[in-house]
Amino acid sequence: MTEPETLALLEVKGPETLEKSPPQALVPNGRKLEGEDEVESLGAESSRVGSSAESPTAREGTEDGLDSTVSEAATLPWGTGPQPSAPFPDPPGWRNIEPEPPESEPPTKLEELPEDEASLLPEKAARAFVPIDLQCIERRPQEDLVVCCEASEGEHRRTFLPPRATHPEPPECKWAEAVVKPPGHSCGGCGGCGGREALRAVASVGAALILFPCLLYGAYAFLPFDAPRLPTMSSRLIYTLRCGVFATFPIVLGILVYGLSLLCFAALRPFGEPRREVEIHRQYVAQSVQLFILYFFNLAVLSTYLPQDALKLLPLLTGLFAISRLIYWLTFAVGRSFRGFGYGLTFLPLLSMLLWNFYYMFVVEPERMLTASESRLDYPDHARSASDYRPRSRG
């Protein structure tokens, strides 16, 4: 182009074209952004004034210049179609710049337009306006691929992770929680309830320690029966075993109740979750069997050392065992700390018999500790007392 043509173009566009205008939003034909009507009206008035001041020769020059620019653009080697976007090299220091978070802008009229009106744009104008997103430029496809891979790996790890093994609580904890607390008593977590329970248990055992000799002496003195004459060791052992049959009654009763509880609560699986209503009877039966073995083993040994007048203690100790086990069973099922009373009535006679046997074995008759000789009733000093023995008459 010639110099007069370029000067005419600059005069038409005005000095505003020298400054870099900000990027305009994409607006279809016939639509204008809000706030631009006033600017365009002012520009139109200024252009009218300038055009009126110009000479007609300048107008002709501008028209010729526009035609020449169109002709030159038509002769360029590339067409009017959309050009492929070539990757531009990143300027230095581009990666060190952190992208600012996009501010929430009010929706433009293009977003509010329906699809029918948005399709009114010509194809060439739609190709010319390409929206640019800084976030898309900043994040390359390779980085997107890495992020997607990391997210998929995290999901796969979560799916293949084994579930955490839960440790089941011991049955004792479940029973303690299942016990119904009396109304009006609340525990604040200070540990005072545990101390009270311990004091009650100790007090119940102390009560058994006091009542055990009193009950045994009262039954020995006031019950109207006597033991038969048992001069030999074998006869005494047989008498003790026959008395022990009565002591099995609470154990057999506990086994029956345990079987019924298994049927009633459908707890027939041996390795299933234990139920409180079933475990109470099972523990009672197991503990009673253990105490029965220890109790009557010591009672049989005691029968070989007792004199004839004291053989009445054998059935009395047997009855005390049966009654004490029933008391313990009842208090254990209710869940009270007073069950120590029933346990004490079983354990304290057992401990007394053990100490008596040790006393006779090591102090009174150490020569007969491990021998099977007859009782001292067969000795010459005790023959007269044995012959003079007469059962006591009752009332």
UniProtKB/Swiss-Prot annotation:
Region feature (Disordered): 1-115
Domain of life: Eukaryota
Segments in the Extracellular topological domain: 226-244, 312-313, 365-395
Transmembrane stretches, start-end: 205-225, 245-265, 291-311, 314-334, 344-364
Cell compartment(s), UniProt: Lysosome; Golgi apparatus, trans-Golgi network; Membrane
Membrane-topology annotation of the record: Multi-pass membrane protein
A cellular component term, taken from the record's GO annotations: lysosomal membrane
Keyword Zinc annotated: no
Major localisation: other
Keyword line: Golgi apparatus, Lysosome, Membrane, Transmembrane, Transmembrane helix
Cytoplasmic face of the membrane: 1-204, 266-290, 335-343
GO biological process: cornification; cuticle development; epithelial cell maturation; establishment of skin barrier; hair follicle morphogenesis; positive regulation of epidermis development; regulated exocytosis
Recorded GO MF terms: identical protein binding
Presence of keyword Flavoprotein: no
Function according to Swiss-Prot or TrEMBL: Contributes to the epidermal integrity and skin barrier function. Plays a role in the lamellar granule (LG) secretory system and in the stratum corneum (SC) epithelial cell formation.
Protein name: Transmembrane protein 79
Species assigned in the record: Bos taurus
Taxonomic classification: Eukaryota, Metazoa, Chordata, Craniata, Vertebrata
